From Swiss-Prot:
Active-site annotation: D808 (proton acceptor)
Low complexity compositional bias, start-end: 313-332, 371-411, 456-487, 559-583
Name of the featured protein: Serine/threonine-protein kinase CLA4
Sequence ranges of Polar residues compositional bias: 430-440, 622-635
Lineage: Eukaryota, Fungi, Dikarya, Ascomycota, Saccharomycotina
CDD domains, sorted: CRIB_PAK_like, PH_Cla4_Ste20, STKc_PAK
Residues covered by region (Disordered): 1-46, 207-231, 298-522, 559-658
Domain CRIB: 237-250
Amino acid sequence: MTSIYTSDLKNHRRAPPPPNGAAGSGSGSSSGSGSGSGSGSGSGSLTNIVTSSNSLGVTANQTKPIQLNINSSKRQSGWVHVKDDGIFTSFRWNKRFMVINDKTLNFYKQEPYSSDGNSNSNTPDLSFPLYLINNINLKPNSGYSKTSQSFEIVPKNNNKSILISVKTNNDYLDWLDAFTTKCPLVQIGENNSGVSSSHPHLQIQHLTNGSLNGNSSSSPTSGLSSSSVLTGGNSGVSGPINFTHKVHVGFDPASGNFTGLPDTWKSLLQHSKITNEDWKKDPVAVIKVLEFYSDINGGNSAAGTPIGSPMINSKTNNNNNDPNNYSSAKNNVQEANLQEWVKPPAKSTVSQFKPSRAAPKPPTPYHLTQLNGSSHQHTSSSGSLPSSGNNNNNNNSTNNNNTKNVSPLNNLMNKSELIPARRAPPPPTSGTSSDTYSNKNHQDRSGYEQQRQQRTDSSQQQQQQQKQHQYQQKSQQQQQQPLSSHQGGTSHIPKQVPPTLPSSGPPTQAASGKSMPSKIHPDLKIQQGTNNYIKSSGTDANQVDGDAKQFIKPFNLQSKKSQQQLASKQPSPPSSQQQQQKPMTSHGLMGTSHSVTKPLNPVNDPIKPLNLKSSKSKEALNETSGVSKTPSPTDKSNKPTAPASGPAVTKTAKQLKKERERLNDLQIIAKLKTVVNNQDPKPLFRIVEKAGQGASGNVYLAEMIKDNNRKIAIKQMDLDAQPRKELIINEILVMKDSQHKNIVNFLDSYLIGDNELWVIMEYMQGGSLTEIIENNDFKLNEKQIATICFETLKGLQHLHKKHIIHRDIKSDNVLLDAYGNVKITDFGFCAKLTDQRNKRATMVGTPYWMAPEVVKQKEYDEKVDVWSLGIMTIEMIEGEPPYLNEEPLKALYLIATNGTPKLKKPELLSNSIKKFLSICLCVDVRYRASTDELLEHSFIQHKSGKIEELAPLLEWKKQQQKHQQHKQETSDTGFA
């Protein structure tokens, strides 16, 4: 199939004599007049004489049988369904054995064999010369059956077309390859719109040796290249075209290898236990597993690699990656990441979920150089204000060219200089037009400087005096760490000059990628009031003070994280607008500087602790981004701004979409405050020991001090360390709204400060089902298994009736108490289905318990929990889930391909439990049982018992407690 023959290319034109010297008819024309006069000879292995008067050139009964060489490698054959587009036959599909040879397309009622003596079996029922094919129209997802693929052969004489339906997609592609090989000049595509010899699944190029070019259809001899060699015998004519078959990612059945694989995928396959037999068995499943793993590391799941991390930047699905950049070290890191992905997230590995990047180096863009330079001066030497505006002009001219990496977000702010407040601009993109923006900024700034000089000549002396007074006042504010309106105004206004920010922010904050606090919106409102003061002549400074008090007052109620997100959502500090409103901004308000500044001091005291915290974060943000958004040349405090454009450029569109879909920090804090208790929980509880960890935090055993030392479980979560904070709110809301005897009871929740969350739950003394299985030597009888499944099913039924999917059912998340009660916990991955979205398609959970539809990235519903319950049942039978000893990539492949896992010793189990497993682990979701059906199953109805019968499983726990108590008493006696 990889050879192209001159006779195939030029059957529709005058052809040279064949190698055996037989005279060719040579009368066939490309017009396809319907005379049926093609070349009368072919290769030695095939002879075709078309004698029918049919306008198609097709004969139903040949006077001379076609001689077939069944073992020829140039032949594609197989069973298909055929019909034409006639009025009476368009609804009938006839099953035929189709064979494409060098010259004809033949259809047989039965498979032809050259070895038997029956000549009728080798007589085609229908024969179609290849030179009469005008084009081939693809009709995917249509045909004889629902899974069939079809294509239409259109003849040149505008007669009836032939529709051919192929059963499988692989056969469909093979046939298209065969037609591409035999008829390279025939157009193949949907609705005759495709390019020559192409179909939607393949990218095919024909590389000629020089003579065959785009004008080959008009030149009768253009198809004959210098490399064409005529040979005798059965080999025919050698191929004049170097045929290449390129696909994005494909599988070559001949070699048994994948084609077009990215280097990262190749490395994963080489280091995995997926064998060549696995590849040949189901190559589509291998590709699905690789895509699944890539999406997990691309941030599509809760445990995925975060945005902006180096892991994502090295993925092959990014548009800007280079396959040559993949090294073995990176591949090893990705393997290790896959190994870590199946483990519960530990607090020590939290840093891998944060975007890590180095702080950009100076020089900074033009309108930010003065800010950064003055900020460093201020930090190191308590600061000093420039003596005149000339310094600003000099620095502006010096740094005017340093705008190559300025994001359009900053330039957009300069375009709207006269607007004090506006909606958040779009996410920053590549700053390719920075030069244009910088030139415009320079022109606008030059015009503004001239205008300011004209209006301020008369007040220069007063300005100098006020500046000295302002500096003294600023030093006082620095010692008190006041909350000044650091986001807006020029440095010439004492109201807008903040204290020196301490440089105690550790550099690790910048590297960890934490979003820093930004108190922007209260000051934004203050600036609006100030601008109104400037624009209205009848407004005095007291009105500005009142506005400042009014808008700063609620600021104390907001947390650091809410301010952080607001800074990223409203990255428009009004200092640039304030500075460029009018010259009165920098000079006209000097007389009111005392009254403007003093009212701010009383507000600073209650906010002082928050401000101390945020000042460090602002320092780290400056180190992280290296770019500030305000063009004010002397403002020393405009640091908490939107992120720099550098890291944002590396984000893919998919990641940005995920970011927009997530709750921002302000919404998260607001939502948390409606759920949690604002009381300090530390005086209420006494932590005893660490009990374990879940998907979103550590769990501690504690005692309630005011409730007779009642034992409870406290789940502590650091909000700053959570990659997706909305999952935490999701977990709290589900537990709070899902009060059930088979779900771990939610007691209360507390938010300490602005980043530490405590969730109080009932304590399950028996521990997890995993511990019970391990400490009982994997000897759970069927009655105990049925009882645990029964209790778990009741909890799942309650969730599913609320249209909630747990999505992480496994033995680690099923707990028992001292009385044998079985309860479900860890709702960090749960999801709620709605009428608008009654199926999910995200990839969360633990791989070994995942349903096949999740691994294959198909839509799923509540029945994924039923599959996980079946895997958990196998855990109780065999001590571990299937494929646990396989490395994760191979396990994902086996889940996707094997379907229902096999039991190690099924002969030891009863029929009822095997039937129970069969309907839990049914690959076809339509036939998989629901929780309601499972509760009515005979295994649950007849085998399950009372929860008290589970008490023997907890004997190991009692023995462990006695041993610890004895050890404690011994140690106390020794000290005594």
